[in-house]
Swiss-Prot record:
Name of the protein: Liprin-beta homolog
Pfam families, sorted: SAM_1, SAM_2
Family: Belongs to the liprin family. Liprin-beta subfamily.
Protein origin, superkingdom: Eukaryota
GO biological process, one term: reproductive process
Tissue: Expressed in pharyngeal muscle, particularly posterior bulb, adjacent to the dorsal and ventral cord (but not in ventral cord neurons), and in body wall muscles.
Biased composition (Low complexity): 50-63, 149-161, 458-474
Keyword rRNA processing in annotation: no
Gene this chain is encoded by: hlb-1
Coiled coil (UniProt feature): 280-328, 364-396
A GO cellular component entry from the record: presynaptic active zone
Compositionally biased spans, kind Polar residues: 434-453, 531-541, 648-684
Region called Disordered, residue ranges: 50-122, 135-161, 341-366, 432-497, 528-550, 648-686
UniProt cross-references to SUPFAM superfamilies, sorted A to Z: SAM/Pointed domain
């Protein structure tokens, strides 16, 4: 048979495309193999279709040749052409049934899907060899076969018989070269079976005559159809499963969307939390700033308190000065009045010119006195403004005073009632209209002119002892009585000496109304003097009266100099020999009643002595005790007084003369600290560290004031009752403090002993200036404000800080090992910094991370600076755990058992957060430097002390024969007398960091 040209061209085109498809199958696996098989099957369909059409058009049928089948797994399923059956029959007969049996075995393998590729390829190679092709070609060309072949559906032609199809050759070659060793998948097999069932349906003659295996093939096809149906069912089931999986995927996508929404909301919550944390940190920083401001306000309050005390002292001194001025003015007026009387009552012709001269001189003096009074009023108004300003400042301080003032109020109430200065102020404030009515005098320091303008100038000094004025104006004195003893005379300084060159601004009267009243009273005295000068007097009682008056008005020449001109000097010189008239009784009685009424209403008997002492304080005199006592004794012997007055004077002098050496500005004792009045000292008026020479002579009242001044007013009664003097106090022991003075607190006993020892040894250290207010602020700086109450109760100051022991710390409830170490290292830092209050830094450098290591800077950090550093290294969420923890820079530098692990435990970092702990350790080691870290590591390796932890406890080892309890794991045993900061630092503390050079180089 001959193929048509169109079919041949299509065949050639398809043959040329086969190698390309095979190459693709080599690269892409089963997918490309499926495409290859599909294209091969289509080519075979075209060949068969074209062959059938050609066989119908031709009339001659050559010998049938083999039709190539391109799939190895279905080659044996196709029956050979009729032309080849006769060729195979002799071979089959020669080999018996071996070939058929073998073929049957292969078919069974195909049915079961177990055919081996290599066995199939060997079978193909064994059956379809080139010799068989040649033999079949020869048989077909001879045409001498006597057996007639049945008609075949396959195309037969000379070209196809002599040359097998190229597709077949390439496919066989691929199988021989084992390039298609993979088994075809199920889909490929189904396609092959469909092609076999659809394209190889034999004719009836072929099924009955030429193909005895046709029933078996039909069974196989039926089984394959059933397998196809089952596979389709499986595919449908799988598609349903895929649909279910898709629904599950959709559900999962919905869940994922919900999770994403939850994650978004969680992130928003976290952002809000971070914002809240930032706000909390800001509030914490503001809180720390407020605490610092409160501490500064407390310090300012303490400063204002001291200033208030000083202002009160100045105010009292001013009141005393004014009172002394009034007394001096009163004495001068009395002397002037007596001079008027003597001038007016003198007899003889020579007294008339003297009286006229005296009258003219009095007019001049009164004009000058008025001028001085005007200046005094102006100065007094200025002084009143200053006093009002001071009082307003005191009122403001009193309104802002805290509860401490209430605590000391009871100690001051009973003393204020007996304060002479307070009584004077009350009199001046309650009765301003007549507050100066008792003194119709002018200040001692008033200027006057000399006689005829030629006399020398002299100065009248204020008296340091005013007993003479007291006797002169005492209500018990009688001008007409005759005194025993020799009358004393006035001591003139010289002839023509006058009072001169004195300013009136040295002393001021209590209030402007009183100063204005002074001029009116002077005018009244002048009128009384002029009226008295016109009366006639008898000369019988003149020597006696004048003698008594002179004896009562005479002041010591060392203290007061009085001169009234030439006439006064002549009068003083001839007082004992010249007979002088005596004033009338009505004038004497009138003057005496006026003076007695004023003094009875305004003054006490012992007041002048007190005023004298206050005046000595104001002038700052350093009086000699022996000299003052001798002067007073001499003065007392020359005077004649009544017995009652002598008793009062002895009482007042006995209490004041013993302490005359201490009555000066800045001394520990005050003039009003007498046995009669009790302790009238306010807090701040007694020095905490007086000189030893003064302290040994202190009495019980002064020592009681001192014990209150150092902060223990609860022991005032015991001290005033049992301690006789300062020397006795210095010689007392600790047991006497507890048994006699009832000081049960051991910290109080230690502080009293420390202060007494420093007074005795005159120890001057930088710690002396460190008070309890600075200690309380220092506790805020180191992060331990919870101990402020107990430190304030024990009045812990600088000297006591240096002397605190482990037993004292336990007594003050400091039992946490971490807090104990914080106090110890902070005290060590204060000692190195010479107790400079501003040595610690509350703020850190913003570029601190770039300046690692810097131990000299870290040692000055406060607790708040450490928190700021933690925020700087991104650990802000843990800083709130440092509240009341106490982690200053001194603890990190000086404490060898404080490591990064200790800080992590204080920050409460979870142990499983190793990255955070490693981050903290890295920054901690870089901050302190390798040397300090190496010292800490070596110290802990020795095993003498455990690493600090927030759960550690301090235990004081008690010496005795009792059974010792086993030490717990977190306990640190210390000796009772071990100092928190020893005098000499031993190997327990690292060296080389935070020395004094670092403080000198700092700007604090």
């Amino acid at each position: 048979m001959v193929y048509s040209s169109s079919s041949m061209s299509n065949t050639n085109i398809r043959r040329r495309s086969v190698p390309i498809t095979i190459q693709k199958s080599r690269m892409d696996g089963f997918a490309e193999a499926n495409q290859l098989l599909s294209s091969a099957l289509e080519q075979l369909d075209d060949i068969i279709r074209n062959g059938n059409s050609t066989s119908r058009s031709t009339t001659t049928i050559g010998s049938a040749g083999p039709t190539p089948i391109i799939k190895k797994s279905f080659r044996d399923l196709l029956p050979p052409p009729p032309a080849l059956r006769s060729t195979f029959s002799p071979r089959i007969m020669e080999n018996g049934h071996s070939n058929l049996a073998h073929k049957q075995h292969i078919n069974d393998d195909i049915d079961n899907g177990n055919a081996d590729d290599e066995r199939s390829s060997r079978e193909i190679n064994r059956q379809w060899i080139s010799t068989d092709w040649k033999h079949r070609t020869d048989l077909g060309s001879d045409g001498s076969s006597g057996v007639e072949s049945p008609p075949s559906d396959l195309p037969t032609s000379s070209s196809s018989l002599f040359s097998p199809p190229r597709v077949y050759q390439e496919f066989v070659k691929a199988i021989d070269e084992q390039t298609m060793t993979e088994r075809p998948d199920l889909e490929t097999r189904l396609k092959i079976m469909q092609w076999v069932a659809g394209r190889t349906s034999p004719s009836p003659s072929m099924s009955t005559v030429s193909c005895p295996e046709y029933p078996e093939l039909q069974d196989k096809l039926h089984r394959l159809a059933m397998a196809r149906d089952s596979l389709q069912l499986q595919v449908s089931v799988l598609s349903e499963q895929v649909g279910a999986q898709k629904e599950k995927i959709k559900d999962l996508e919905t869940v994922i969307a919900l999770k994403r929404n939850n994650l978004t909301s969680t992130e928003e919550l976290l952002q809000d939390k971070y914002h809240r944390i930032d706000e909390c940190q800001e509030l914490e920083s503001k809180k720390m700033d407020l605490l610092a401001e409160v501490s500064s306000l407390k310090l300012r309050y303490a400063t204002l308190e001291r200033e208030k005390n000083e202002t009160e002292k100045k105010l009292r001194l001013s009141q005393n000065e004014m009172d002394h001025v009034n007394q001096s003015m009163h004495g001068m007026v009395v002397q002037q009045q007596l001079a008027h009387h003597t001038n007016g009552h003198s007899s003889g012709g020579y007294m008339s010119p003297l009286r006229e001269h005296r009258s003219e001189k009095n007019d001049d003096e009164m004009s000058q006195l008025r001028t001085a009074v005007q200046r005094l009023m102006a100065d007094n108004e200025h002084k009143s403004l200053q006093i009002n300003t001071l009082r307003n400042a005191l009122d403001e301080q009193m309104r802002s005073r805290s509860q401490q003032e209430d605590f000391y109020a009871s100690q001051r109430n009973y003393t204020d009632n007996f304060d002479v200065n307070a009584q004077i102020r009350r009199i001046l404030m309650d009765e301003p209209s007549d507050s100066m009515s008792h003194s119709t005098s002018f200040p001692v320091s008033l200027s006057s002119t000399t006689s005829n303008g030629k006399g020398p100038r002299s100065t009248v000094q204020s008296s340091s002892s005013y007993n003479s004025s007291l006797s002169a104006v005492s209500p018990q004195h009688n001008w007409s009585s005759a005194g025993a003893g020799t009358p004393r005379q006035l001591h003139p300084i010289g002839g023509n000496q006058r009072v001169n060159n004195i300013t009136s601004a040295q002393y001021c009267s209590p209030s402007p109304p009183a100063a204005r009243q002074l001029a009116a009273e002077l005018d009244e005295l002048r009128r009384n003097g002029n009226e008295g000068a016109n009366h006639n007097y008898s000369s019988a009682s003149l020597p006696r009266g004048v003698g008594k008056a002179s004896s009562t008005l005479t002041l010591p020449s060392k203290k007061l100099s009085v001169a009234s001109g030439t006439s006064v000097g002549e009068l003083g010189g001839s007082m004992s020999s010249v007979a002088q008239p005596t004033p009338k009784r009505n004038y004497r009685a009138q003057m005496n009643r006026w003076i007695n009424e004023k003094l009875r209403r305004k003054r006490a008997v012992s007041a002048p002595n007190l005023v004298e002492s206050d005046d000595e304080i104001a002038r700052g005199r350093n009086l000699n005790n022996a000299t003052s006592q001798s002067n007073l004794k001499n003065f007392s012997r020359e005077r004649t007084r009544s017995s009652l007055r002598n008793i009062f004077s002895k009482l007042t002098r006995s209490t004041s003369q013993d302490q005359s050496n201490s009555f000066r500005r800045g001394s520990a004792a005050r003039s009003t600290s007498t046995a009669r009045l009790g302790s009238t000292n306010h807090l701040g008026t007694v020095s905490k560290r007086p000189p030893l020479s003064q302290f040994v002579d202190w009495r019980s009242e002064q020592l009681a004031d001192w014990i209150a001044e150092i902060g223990y007013p609860q022991y005032m009664n015991e001290v005033s009752r049992h301690v006789r003097s300062g020397r006795h106090f210095l010689n007392m022991s600790m047991n006497e403090y507890e048994g006699v003075l009832n000081i049960k607190n051991p910290v109080h006993r230690k502080r009293v002993a420390i202060l007494l020892r420093r007074i005795e040894e005159d120890i001057m250290e930088p710690a002396n200036k460190w008070d309890v207010h600075q200690t309380l602020r220092w506790l805020d700086d180191i992060g331990l404000p919870q101990y402020k109450d107990v430190f304030a109760e024990n009045v812990v100051d600088g000297p006591l800080l240096l002397s605190l022991t482990a037993n004292d710390a336990v007594e003050m409830k400091v039992v946490n090992a971490h807090h104990y170490a914080t106090l110890a290292r902070s005290i060590q830092f204060l000692k190195k910094a010479d107790f400079r209050f501003n040595a610690m830094e509350k703020l850190i450098d913003q570029n601190i991370v770039e300046k690692y290591p810097c131990p000299d800077v870290v040692v000055r950090w406060t607790h708040s600076a450490t928190c700021e550093w933690l925020r700087k290294i991104d650990l802000a969420e843990f800083t709130q755990n440092l509240l009341f923890a106490g982690v200053p820079g001194a603890l990190m530098i000086y404490e060898p058992s404080f490591t990064a692990e200790s800080l992590a435990e204080i920050l409460q970092m979870p142990p499983h957060k190793t990255l955070l702990r490693r981050h903290l350790t890295s920054h901690f080691n870089q901050l302190l430097g390798p040397k300090i870290i190496a010292d800490k590591r070596d110290f802990l390796a020795a095993g003498n002390y455990p690493q600090i932890s927030p759960t550690g406890r301090v235990k004081v080892v008690k010496k005795g024969f009792s059974l010792t309890r086993k030490k717990a794991k977190n306990e640190i045993c210390l000796e009772p007398e071990e100092l928190l900061c020893p005098q000499v630092l031993v190997h327990k503390y690292p060296t080389g960091a935070g020395d004094n050079s670092s403080f000198e180089s700092s700007n604090v």
